[in-house]
């Protein structure tokens, strides 16, 4: 298609990448000559002993990533093509010339031919519930119908970094979670809810001993009641590594509920088998619907329900309000705790501790009465 223009190439970049001389543009039977030249070039490439790629590091990283996430061969081949499309605009342009204004079925057929893989396996690998889409490695532009609209690069990984930095699981984990900050409160600071706190701690302890799946605790309550601190304390009490799912990316831009659901799935895969506790703060981003749009959780209701029954790494979910959550979701949590406000006496002691006795008794008392004052 790129040589069908009456005045020459549709794309000089593609012609150059294919090794076609500019003189061919002036030939009367240009399409016929181009087909012959490309056929010969393809034959020589197939016969050569050249390796699949000059990008050794990139190939190693793709293989390591596929192995860690247990991608099957078809998924790995699709991911590999998507990486090269992302870092090579000329390749993307060429593929769009081949697949322009096509439906999804035609796209899958083209991809199956390119990768020499069964159509059914290609279609299955690109399903929303499979790893490539589920982990946010790839995504689909629902408003376009060109080749690259069906094979968009996702938000989880930086394709350019795969080409210049060795892959590490630690780097991948940092893309979706951060180590939780050490708690600034002590276990004794939650004496006002001691019975429930001990119940949750003991329940989690038993869950780790028995390797139980589908363990989820929901903490909710007004800001300043110590929900996040309590989650960190639970991890400390049980000698667990604690990780928090971020609500912002590396550039401090807020990320949406759909991407956060992708991140939690990837984090579960990476942390499976470890003594870890996963904290999902500000879950309103995922569960809250608006008048005109369903929440990310409502849009994937069956999946969320299944996730809450089978997640391998125990989780603490934190919200200021559960009024936005469907009752069907609430019933899936093992324990739901409404976190009461810290007693004023306890708040006053914390204020004095943080202020290093530089405030008067009246100032301390005033601050302790502020419900929005966080620990």
Model-derived features with residue positions:
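Intrinsically disordered, low-complexity N-terminal extensions of AAA+/P-loop NTPases
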Residues: 1-215, 222, 234-298
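Short acidic alpha-helix initiation/capping motifs at coil-to-helix transition points
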Residues: 52-60, 343, 357-359, 375
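Hydrophobic/aromatic beta-strand patches that form the interior of the parallel beta-sheet core
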Residues: 217, 243, 316, 335-337
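Conserved lysine of the Walker
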Residues: 227
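Conserved catalytic/switch belt of AAA+ P-loop NTPases
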Residues: 283-335
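Conserved AAA+ ATPase "SRH/arginine-finger" region at the nucleotide-binding site
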Residues: 319, 334-354
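Conserved AAA+ ATPase small/helical "lid" subdomain
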Residues: 348-351, 355-375
């Amino acid at each position: 298609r790129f040589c069908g223009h009456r005045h020459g190439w549709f794309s000089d970049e593609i012609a150059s990448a294919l090794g076609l001389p500019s003189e061919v543009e002036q030939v009367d039977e240009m399409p016929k000559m181009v087909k012959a030249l490309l056929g010969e070039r393809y034959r020589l490439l197939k016969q050569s002993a050249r390796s699949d790629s000059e990008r050794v590091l990139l190939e190693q990283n793709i293989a390591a990533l596929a192995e860690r996430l247990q991608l099957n061969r078809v998924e790995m081949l699709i991911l590999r093509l998507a990486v090269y499309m992302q870092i090579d605009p000329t390749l993307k342009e060429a593929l769009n010339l081949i697949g322009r204004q096509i439906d999804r079925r035609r796209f899958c057929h083209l991809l199956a031919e390119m990768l020499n893989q069964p159509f059914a396996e290609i279609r299955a690998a690109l399903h929303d519930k499979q790893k490539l889409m589920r982990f946010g490695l790839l995504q689909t532009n629902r408003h376009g119908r060109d080749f690259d609209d069906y094979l968009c690069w996702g938000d989880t990984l930086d394709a350019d970094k795969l080409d210049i930095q060795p892959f590490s699981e630690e780097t991948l984990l940092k893309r979706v979670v951060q180590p939780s900050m050490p708690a600034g409160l002590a276990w004794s600071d939650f004496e006002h809810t001691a019975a429930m706190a001990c119940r949750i701690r003991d329940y989690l302890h038993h869950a780790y001993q028995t390797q139980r799946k589908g363990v989820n605790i929901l903490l909710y309550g007004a800001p300043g009641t110590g929900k996040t601190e309590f989650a960190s304390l639970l991890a400390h009490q049980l000698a667990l590594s604690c990780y928090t799912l971020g609500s912002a990316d590396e550039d401090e831009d807020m990320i949406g509920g759909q991407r956060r659901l992708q991140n939690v799935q990837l984090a579960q895969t990476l942390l499976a088998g470890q003594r870890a506790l996963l904290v999902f703060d500000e879950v309103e981003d995922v569960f809250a619907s608006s008048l005109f749009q369903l929440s990310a959780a409502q849009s994937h209701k069956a999946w969320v329900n299944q996730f809450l029954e089978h997640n391998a790494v125990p989780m603490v979910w934190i919200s200021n309000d559960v009024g936005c959550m469907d009752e069907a979701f609430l019933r899936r949590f093992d324990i739901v705790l409404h976190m009461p406000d810290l007693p004023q006496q306890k708040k006053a002691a914390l204020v004095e501790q943080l202020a290093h006795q530089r405030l008067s008794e009246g100032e301390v008392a005033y601050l302790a009465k502020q419900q929005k004052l966080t620990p």
